[in-house]
A protein has these predicted regions:
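Active-site loop-to-helix "anion-binding N-cap" substructures in soluble metabolic enzymes
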Residues: 1-137
């Protein structure tokens, strides 16, 4: 997917899906990710230059296989975004919990534990519950 305003990291660490071994370093991939692999850590190095120039950041969910202990990419991205000064909208319970655990809530413009709902609202301009309430006015 190529779009000047949507940035998808190109370097990731992947691991065999069957392993679920958080002690293995995995394998750095800079090409197509094989279908039998899962992303363990997204390396956001290439995002540093871009993030220093943007005015708004929308981020939903952790980077990679966060639930199984692979937190490096998510931690680094969190700190990068916190230091940009850009207005940021962050969605997803894991992302918000991490930001809160680091005490960085004040560095972000908007935090939502409902990441999918946040994205739906941004895309559609409303949510089903809001639409019902608005139609009853």
């Amino acid at each position: 997917m190529n779009h000047p305003k949507i940035i998808i990291p190109t370097k990731v660490v992947v691991q065999n899906d069957a392993m679920h071994d958080t002690t293995s370093p995995g394998k750095l991939i800079t090409e197509t990710i094989p279908s039998d692999r899962i992303v363990d850590v997204v390396i956001p190095d290439e995002l540093k230059a871009v993030l220093s120039e943007v005015k708004t950041i929308i981020w939903n969910g952790p980077m990679g296989n966060y639930e199984n202990g692979f937190t490096e990419g998510t931690l680094e991205l969190t700190k990068l975004i916190a230091d940009t000064g850009a207005f940021s909208l962050i969605g997803g319970g894991d992302s918000v919990a991490l930001i809160e655990s680091l005490g960085l809530e004040q560095k972000f413009g908007f935090l939502s534990t409902g990441g999918g709902a946040m994205l739906e609202y941004l895309a559609q301009g409303t949510l089903p519950g809001i639409a019902v309430l608005e139609s009853q006015e």
